[in-house]
Amino acid sequence: MHFAIILLFLLVIIAIVYTYVDLIDVHHEEVRYPITVFDNTRAPLIEPPSEIVIEGNAHECHKTLTPCFTHGDCDLCREGLANCQLFDEDTIVKMRGDDGQEHETLIRAGEAYCLALDRERARSCNPNTGVWLLAETETGFALLCNCLRPGLVTQLNMYEDCNVPVGCAPHGRIDNINSASIRCVCDDGYVSDYNADTETPYCRPRTVRDVMYDESFFPRAPCADGQVRLDHPALNDFYRRHFRLEDICVIDPCSVDPISGQRTSGRLFHQPTVNGVGINGCNCPADDGLLPVFNRHTADTGMVRQSDRTVANACLQPFNVHMLSLRHVDYKFFWGRSDHTEFADADMVFQANVNQLSHERYRAILYSLLESHPDVTEIVTVNMGVMKISVSYDTTLKNILLPSSVFRLFRFKESGTAQPVCFFPGVGRCITVNSDSCIRRHAGGQVWTAETFTNSWCVLSREGTHIKVWSRASRYPRGDAPAALRLRGFFLNNDRERNTIRAVTTGDMTQGQQIDALTQILETYPNYSV
């Protein structure tokens, strides 16, 4: 019963829904109304003008800067893109006038003007290196950063900031481009300076005036080894006048090899003389391979003060080995001058390999060896060369406590008359017995006997500590008169061969009539013979 009622109820609901849907589903037919087309075949055609002129504003804000407060104030401008531009910083406006010339106008910070700005513009401008610039273009103004000192700080292009440091080169760099005062940080050996004409800082080589009071550069006395006080009596007064302090320590000028620039054991000395002037020069220890020379180019302007006598003012150290290790060393000297016992009159001739040079610069004075040594027949090797250095201004007029130089060693051996500390004769014969012993002074009768019965000539003799030639130059056979004496080898040890004196005759040095001329010149030296 209940089931039948429920079924009947559902059928009624379905019937109601179906009836409602049928009622709302209405179809309308589209009604089309006819449209009447207008006939314009007889209407005349419009003929537009070939040129349309739109009148602009009469006021040109770019020719006459126009102050403003709002963008509306710029509607009067002929420039259509003009807006009210407020300036936060001082800016220079560059405009071309009616005369065709560029004119600059300064706009102060806080002022506003009607301007048409180009979209291509600089985004920033360092006030320490640049200034804002409005440059007139075809479309308006371009806001640019104009570099104040492009030689110091520049820009990558015209639309960039001035932030590329290029100054102070090549020996330094700019310290800080964001500083009001730009200065240089310079490399070692250079100092920052300022050119007032160009208003530009730069790096220049350091001079003495930059460090004269810097104790890290010029220490104060007591001075270390290899340095001397500025008031040293042997120093040139020129350097002393540039310092107010006399106890400043400077490099000993004799301790620097003038060719290689290397430091050596050479030392400056001053020896007082009777007349009170004194002798100034360099002492060059022979044991350290130093050779005393006189540099005439720095005689007046060098650090060594000139004295009343010409003395060695530099020490050379040409070899990186001891001179005894060299292939050949010859000491050639002349004995005829009146001051022979005080000053050397000598040259030294070396045969050395290029690998034995202490510095590359010494190659310039090492010449190719064209002949073998006069006393030794040997093959000349490829890398062997000859070097000649004058030691003529070495002196014994200095403190005996100083390390011995070449000439002092020579004088020590020259004064010896007993083996092994002496020089031996390598030419002539002055006595019949023990003629090869140390060079000594013999009586005239002994010399006559030796020359007569041995058919030889007496050559080497002495007068006190001074070795001389026995006879005048004109007495010897033509071409046999000694013009110089030489020691083969180096007399640092007592080897007989290294301490034997040989003669360089007039015939060895020249020929023909020049032999007679040279002989006459030798006759003019009072100390030539005993």
Curated annotation (Swiss-Prot):
Subunit text: Forms the PIF complex together with PIF2 and PIF3. The complex also interacts with per os infectivity factor PIF0.
InterPro entries recorded: PIR (IPR007784)
GO cellular component, one term: membrane
Role noted for this protein: Per os infectivity factor that mediates the specific binding of occluded virions (ODV) to the host midgut target cells.
The keyword Membrane is annotated on this UniProt entry: yes
Signal peptide residue numbers: 1-15
Protein name (database record): Per os infectivity factor 1
The organism of origin for this protein: Autographa californica nuclear polyhedrosis virus
Keywords on record: Membrane, Signal, Virion
Top-level taxon of the source organism: Viruses
Pfam families tied to this protein: PIF (PF05092)
